[in-house]
Amino acid sequence: MGSGAIPIVLVFLLVFLTWQTIYSSNRDLVRAKEWGDLARRALPFGALALMALSLFVVQGYREGWVLITWMFVSGALIVLASVLSISSTERRANRAFRSGNFQKAAELYRELAEEKPLARHHAYLGAALGASERYEESVDASTEAIKKDPKYGLAYYNRALVLRRMGKKSRAVKDLKQALEADLPRRFRSAARKILEELA
């Protein structure tokens, strides 16, 4: 393999890994056939792919301003794509949740669930309600997420955490096992296993 092929291989490897990350984080959208939302989530991938492909054109120019302009435009495109990949309501809800304002997060997630009743929106609503100690509402929201997508593991996981807080150990164990069998992100899998060990 020549030295010119190495950047090509690295670019395609980067594009492939980026797509895998986007796909694995959004399998629920694929199951729900929400192609528009999936495409929106893939905008940063598209921007990165465009940047990677345009690199081959830019390499031929010797003027420094071309490379600097390319870097600036590519960076701006990636930032813009990242901003557009998630709705402003979801971004505000996520920010409220991360900052501990669970009441505001619940309001915004409820708005999202009413606007577009995806399993993820109901699961996020359930998480915010659970963090607000509104346990019955949280269980209802997570149950609605499971009805919408029985393979959405995060809904089982969130419901299990709330059931555990409510003292319903056997139901929590059942949901944690379901979460591990379903489509649960890797970082939650280890937490689910640890909680199962504690409850056993």
Please identify what each model-predicted range represents.
Residues 98, 131-132, 165, 198:
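Register position in tetratricopeptide repeats
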Residues 1-94, 98-100:
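Long, contiguous interaction/recruitment modules in multidomain scaffold/adaptor proteins
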Residues 116-117, 150, 184:
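Short coil turns that delineate tetratricopeptide repeat
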Residues 86, 119-120, 153-154, 187:
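Helix-start (N-cap) detector for alpha-helical repeat units in TPR-like alpha-solenoids
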